[in-house]
C-alpha cells in the first residue's frame, strides 16, 4: 500500500523551456531593466536639461540599447498577461498599464532609433512629463514588477 500523496509523487518538469515558462519568460527582469534605463535617461534630461542631455547621453545609440529590453519586455508582458497573480484589482490595473506603456513605447523608439535618427523628438514631451514618470509612474511600475507572481504554467501555455 502506498501512502505517498500526489504532491510528493508529482515530478516537476526540469527542462530549460519549463524553467523559462515558469519564470514568466523573465518578463520581470526585462521590464525592470527597461524602466531602470528609462529612469536614467529621464533623470539625465531633468538634471542636465535638454541641450546637454541630447548632446551627450540621450542619443540614437542609447535609444537603441533601451529598445532591446523594451521590445523583449513588451512581447513577454503580453505572453504572461493571463498568468500573473494579483492581490487586488488595482494591482491588475497597474500591471496592465505597465505592459501597455512599455508596448506602446516600442513604436516610438523604433521611429526615433531607425527611421528619423533624431532624438530631439523627446523635446516634444514637456519637462513635467519626465518629472511625472520619475516621481510617480516609474516607482509604481518598479514596485509592481518586484512583487509580480505567476500562476503555475500549464502544458497549454
Where do the protein language model's features map onto the residues?
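Cytosolic juxtamembrane helix and N-cap/initiation of the first transmembrane helix
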Residues: 1-39
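Short amphipathic alpha-helical segments that mediate assembly, nucleic-acid/protein binding
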Residues: 4, 13, 28, 67, ...
Amino acid at each position: 500500500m502506498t501512502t505517498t500523496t500526489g504532491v510528493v509523487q508529482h515530478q516537476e518538469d526540469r527542462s530549460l523551456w519549463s524553467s523559462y515558462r515558469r519564470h514568466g519568460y523573465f518578463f520581470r527582469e526585462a521590464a525592470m531593466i527597461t524602466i531602470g534605463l528609462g529612469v536614467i535617461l529621464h533623470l539625465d534630461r531633468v538634471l542636465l536639461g535638454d541641450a546637454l542631455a541630447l548632446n551627450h547621453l540621450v542619443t540614437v545609440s542609447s535609444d537603441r540599447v533601451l529598445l532591446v529590453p523594451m521590445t523583449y519586455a513588451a512581447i513577454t508582458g503580453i505572453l504572461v498577461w493571463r498568468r500573473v497573480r494579483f492581490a487586488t484589482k488595482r494591482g491588475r490595473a497597474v500591471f496592465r498599464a505597465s505592459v501597455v506603456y512599455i508596448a506602446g513605447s516600442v513604436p516610438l523608439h523604433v521611429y526615433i532609433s531607425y527611421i528619423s535618427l533624431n532624438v530631439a523628438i523627446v523635446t516634444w514631451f514637456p519637462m513635467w512629463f519626465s518629472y511625472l514618470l520619475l516621481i510617480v509612474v516609474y516607482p509604481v511600475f518598479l514596485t509592481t514588477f518586484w512583487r509580480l507572481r505567476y500562476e503555475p504554467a500549464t502544458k497549454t501555455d
